[in-house]
């Protein structure tokens, strides 16, 4: 089986980490490197079609993200193939893929006979930053073309800062509360040395930054310690913390699903527990 690995602007870490977990024995891998970063898909779609016609591949694999999703879908349409976006794994013998559905509550196994099969990867937490692509692959460079005529202007946003949540070693995930709780939550998190994230339901209550959402529609994290408080354990939220090394769940409902996904669970009012934890930490430090 011939597989084309598409990377964009030498950002290889996510796709390289995913490849390392797959078994591609018996496959011929090629590396299609798009560089520099295109602004819109139209700059590279024609070139991708031409490249596939010169060196056909059974599977064309794109990196995670909205741009990878778009290229996968539109290239498959142009080549009369099939596209599946945000896959988590690929089984070579059956050419079947797995991906999450229904807010991460279900894992689906999908299969199609159409070729080429264009795939984009699901976002991953904790991808090794120094992961490298397999050696020995044929590399083919794809240079983006001119911007399309319909694109009147573009703006390049400089100095976009990365949210501290993405690199935090300790994270406090809050699922309940309202705007009145924000100051107390921030104080507790600071004393715990943790960054704060929120469930989507909590963000919808207002008063917190929507960029702090944890889960499939927000951050996917892999901290050393994650404390989840006041959250039932919905699959969409827990997808954002499932790669944590150690998970503590605090909830007053002993039957909450969050406890089945935690290393340690405490059934109590979460504010009381966090305040006691802060007190004990500071007592031990004295």
Swiss-Prot record:
Belongs to the ETF alpha-subunit/FixB family. Signal peptide: none annotated. It comes from the Bacteria. Keywords: Electron transport, FAD, Flavoprotein, Transport. FAD binds at residues 225-253. This is Putative electron transfer flavoprotein subunit YgcQ. YgcQ and YgcR form a heterodimer. It holds the Pfam family ETF. May play a role in a redox process. GO terms for biological process: fatty acid beta-oxidation using acyl-CoA dehydrogenase. GO terms for molecular function: electron transfer activity; flavin adenine dinucleotide binding. PANTHER family: ELECTRON TRANSFER FLAVOPROTEIN ALPHA, PROTEIN FIXB-RELATED.
